[in-house]
Structure formats: C-alpha cells, structure tokens
Amino acid sequence: MEGIIIKGIGGFYYIKTDEGIIECKARGKFRYNSLKPMVGDRVTIKVENGKGVIEDIHERSSELIRPTVANVTQAFVVFAIKNPDINLDLLNRFLTLCEYNDIHAVVCLNKEDLCTEEEKENLKELINDIGYEVLFINAKEGKGFDALKERLEHNITVLCGPSGAGKSTLLNAFIDREHMETGSVSEKIGRGKHTTRHSELIDVDNGYLVDTPGFTTLDVTFIDRDSLKYCFPEFNDYNNLCKFNGCNHYKEPKCAVKEAVEEGKINKLRYEFYIKTLEEIINRRGN
C-alpha cells in the first residue's frame, strides 16, 4: 500500500492512503541507513496485526530543512504591499532560495486594498518581468483565495515570507475552510488551528499545504558561487552567450548578462542584488 506522510510525531507517522489515514512506525533499517522519514515523503507501507509499518521511502524530489518537509513543489511567497512596505531585497532572497531548491514560486501580495491600481500594475510588471506570477490577495477578507486554491492542485505548497505579511492569517483561512468543507477534523492526527510546532500537510483540493512557514532562515551563502546565476531565471537566455565558459557575470569581460542589463533587458536592481549576493558568498567562503 502506498501513501504520503502528512504528519510525524514521537516516532509515529500518519500516512494518507486511499483507505484513509494509517498510523505507522518506521522499519529499523532506516535508522541504520541514517534515513529518517519526513513529512511529504511518499512511502510504501504494510499493515501487520493491525499496526502499520513503513517499508520503503520513495525517492525525494526535494528536501527542506526548515521546515523539515520532502517533495515540496511550490511556494507561495507572501509579502504585504503596505504596512510594512515591500522590501525587494528580501523578496529576492526568498525567490533565490526557491530557485535553488527547484521550487516553483508564486508571489502573493497581501493587503492589496492599501494600494492604487497603478501601484499594483507597476509591481505586477516588475515581478512578471523577472519570471514570476503575481497574485493580489487580502488574507483577512479572503480575496484571491480561489486563485490560490487552484494552484494548490497536485502540489505540495509551502508558505514563506517576512513576519507581518499575513502568512498565519492565510494559513488559518485555508485550515478553517477545509474544516468547514469536510465537516470534521481528523481526531487521529488532532489537526487544529496553526498552533503546532510539528510540520503537517493540510489536504486541500487534491494538493497539500505545509502548515509551518518555509525558509525561516534566509542565509544564501551556502550556495556555490558558480551555481548562483542559475537561481535567476532572467539570466537563462544569456548564460551561454558570454565569451567565457563559466562566466559568473561579475568582473568578466564581454558578458552577455551585463550587456542585457545595460540594454534594459534585465532589471538593474535584480542584477545589483545578484552581485551583492555573489560577493557575500565569496567573502563568506573565501573563494
């Protein structure tokens, strides 16, 4: 029997299967192989004498550390438009981490009622130009909720963003609506409002939402200096057009990315953020 781990606590794992949620323990072989089951893992289980056992952990497509979740495919990067104002460097940092982890990012701009249509259009154009979809939402009023739900299907989605952006409000709105639609809360896993410290997957419209914020640490200096450029999708059309193989678009001559910046084809502020991050990596790692 196959399923997905939606919660793990105290050595027990709760597996969502076609036959319902089954409480399992892991085989001892995983400890010997230093492989610990994670929320989000797709697994093969066996029920013996009424007790479930995890027999196999399927290959992971991704693995986050904070929160500890496997196979995340999508991130809702939640920022407030106002109160506080958008910090573009911080937004870029979240987007860089999403790209590094091969996670599709959707930028969700909350408190959309606090800005003009012109301001929204300018922000949308800015973010679209660097390769990301933008959704305008109002987490308290539920505006934009249906558009978010559409994007949850067939994904494991994590919410990330700075404090005060509305992540908890949005998350609790998803949890409350899911409870109303299903009519009950699973007593076995004890799901309630967003109070648990243990990561859990919320089943929403043929997809899953991680109930703890993603990327709670924003350090990017672990990224290899030669890999950073691949975290900027707007560089993709130019990476192979530079004179030198392996060009990092830094101090190298005849660089196609730098030329694209000068021609206005790549956003100058994004490129400056890239250089600042690259120098941070070089200075931190001494290479």
UniProtKB/Swiss-Prot annotation:
Organism of origin: Clostridium perfringens (strain SM101 / Type A)
Keyword Oxidoreductase annotated: no
Sites where the protein binds Zn(2+): 242, 247, 249, 255
Keywords attached to this entry: Cytoplasm, GTP-binding, Hydrolase, Metal-binding, Nucleotide-binding, Ribosome biogenesis, RNA-binding, rRNA-binding, Zinc
InterPro entries, sorted: G_CP_dom, NA-bd_OB-fold, P-loop_NTPase, Ribosome_biogen_GTPase_RsgA, RsgA_GTPase_dom, RsgA_N
Enzyme class: hydrolase
Residue ranges of coiled coil: none
GO cellular component, one term: cytoplasm
HAMAP family xref list: GTPase_RsgA
SUPFAM superfamilies: Nucleic acid-binding proteins, P-loop containing nucleoside triphosphate hydrolases
Cofactor dependency: Zn(2+)
GO molecular function, one term: metal ion binding
Subunit and partners: Monomer. Associates with 30S ribosomal subunit, binds 16S rRNA.
PANTHER family: SMALL RIBOSOMAL SUBUNIT BIOGENESIS GTPASE RSGA, SMALL RIBOSOMAL SUBUNIT BIOGENESIS GTPASE RSGA 1, MITOCHONDRIAL-RELATED
Family: Belongs to the TRAFAC class YlqF/YawG GTPase family. RsgA subfamily.
Name listed for the protein in its UniProt record: Small ribosomal subunit biogenesis GTPase RsgA
Localization (cell): Cytoplasm
Lineage: Bacteria, Bacillati, Bacillota, Clostridia, Eubacteriales
